[in-house]
């Protein structure tokens, strides 16, 4: 195994090791701040610039300096008015001094504030998700463009020359500059040839012949000076990037909010919803987000209520699917909207309702959705228990029947942030053409 030795010299009064630790500490502080913003903010706001504050004590890089509380100094700096050579100056104590004696006399430092760009925010957000680099680059692309014709240009690649427009410009220029035509020169040459065959005795005959020759010479020189195609005539096809045609998508977020879904489970679910939103934002210009939460009853709520309401109760998952179907029929017809759904749950469900959920997906929802993702959030200790995909709760087993029949259905278990990305590989990777809607 190769060993790398860093032989770089330390900068003045600083240590490279300290600098690296400082940068790591600052990055961890930024990650913590972004994580809190994602946790407390809206899903759609993740893909935007963020104002970030850091404590002022954390933005200074460590440096070596003398300790004023230790060591001996046997000299007096020039220019002071208090001390002279030979005076004994008591050292300051190592304690912090009296508690309130100096209140109001010290100077405090404000927090250091700066703006993180959209790309920097996404870098920090993606760090825990372990996304491949190419996927990160694709997600950062805010708009997808295609090339379209946009008139003509006087410069460009030879492969883009527009012959028709070039010849049109050439023809107009030759008319404007009165370039002699080939027919005109040939007619003049025929007339000269005819006169040359006649007897040359008369003076008028010789004068006429000389005039015609001079005229022919002028026309030929003018024709050579005015080229048939000049560089100013050339036109190239011009292309400009154009956003893809407007397309609309709706993203349904379904989540179980019963007592078994704690803060860790909700945080993982929110990361999953954020990542799906970023994928869809790259494909579609307009995205609506519908939040449906359920216990033993389901309802459409706003984002704040979806994640932070304290309501809890029993668990009947089919109520969320019925509510989603109602919203689709009322506001999002499948022939006008691309429908995506993401469901997060811990797998708990009332007895007998899991079969009802599978029936709703089979008969109603999967024919309307472009993609449906089910995420079951488990504890890391349960990963070994559910080693195979066949083992699991009744809801998991019921959804396995849907997964086997619909290629646009994807299900997975998540125990930590790094488990979130694989659920997107199948949907957004290159795959053969297939009909998603049956």
From Swiss-Prot:
Residues 93-105 have a biased composition (Gly residues). Transmembrane segments: none annotated. InterPro entries: UPF0229. It comes from the Bacteria. Residues 55-107 are annotated as: Disordered. Belongs to the UPF0229 family. This is UPF0229 protein R01398. It comes from Rhizobium meliloti (strain 1021).
């Amino acid at each position: 195994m190769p060993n790398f030795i860093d032989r770089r010299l330390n900068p003045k009064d600083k240590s490279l090791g300290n600098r690296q630790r400082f940068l790591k500490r600052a990055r961890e502080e930024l990650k913590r701040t972004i994580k809190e913003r994602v946790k407390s903010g809206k899903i759609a706001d993740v893909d935007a610039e963020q104002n970030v504050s850091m404590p002022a004590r954390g933005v200074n890089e460590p440096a070596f300096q003398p300790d004023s509380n230790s060591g001996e100094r046997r000299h007096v700096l020039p220019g002071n008015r208090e001390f002279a050579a030979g005076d004994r100056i008591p050292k300051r104590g190592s304690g912090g001094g009296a508690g309130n004696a100096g209140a109001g006399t010290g100077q405090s430092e404000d927090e250091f504030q700066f703006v993180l760009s959209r790309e920097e925010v996404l870098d920090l957000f993606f760090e825990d998700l372990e996304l491949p680099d190419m996927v990160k680059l694709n997600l950062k692309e805010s708009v997808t463009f295609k090339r379209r014709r946009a008139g003509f240009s006087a410069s460009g690649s030879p492969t883009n020359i527009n012959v028709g427009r070039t010849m049109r410009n050439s023809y107009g220029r030759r008319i404007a500059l009165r370039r002699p035509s080939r027919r005109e020169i040939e007619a003049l040459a025929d007339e000269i040839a005819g006169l040359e065959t006649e007897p040359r005795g008369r003076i008028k005959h010789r004068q006429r012949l000389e005039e015609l020759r001079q005229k022919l010479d002028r026309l030929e020189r003018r024709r050579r000076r005015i080229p048939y195609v000049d560089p100013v005539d050339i036109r190239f096809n011009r292309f400009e990037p154009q956003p893809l045609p407007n397309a609309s998508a709706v993203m349904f977020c379904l989540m179980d909010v019963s007592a078994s879904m704690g803060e860790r489970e909700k945080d993982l679910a929110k990361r999953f919803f954020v990542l799906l939103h970023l994928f869809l934002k790259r494909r579609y210009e307009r995205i609506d987000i519908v939040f449906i939460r359920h216990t033993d009853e389901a309802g459409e709520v706003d984002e704040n209520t979806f994640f932070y309401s304290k309501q809890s109760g029993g668990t009947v998952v089919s109520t969320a699917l019925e509510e989603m179907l109602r919203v689709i029929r009322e506001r999002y017809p499948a022939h006008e909207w691309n429908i995506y759904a993401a469901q997060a749950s811990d797998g708990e469900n009332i007895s007998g309702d899991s079969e009802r959920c599978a029936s709703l997906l089979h008969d109603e929802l999967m024919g309307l959705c472009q993609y449906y993702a089910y995420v079951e959030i488990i504890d890391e200790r349960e990963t070994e228990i559910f080693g195979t995909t066949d083992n699991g709760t009744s809801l998991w087993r019921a959804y396995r029947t849907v997964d086997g029949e619909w290629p646009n259905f994807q299900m997975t278990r998540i125990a930590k942030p790094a488990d979130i990305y694989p659920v997107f590989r199948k949907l957004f990777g290159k795959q053969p053409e297939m009909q998603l809607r049956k």
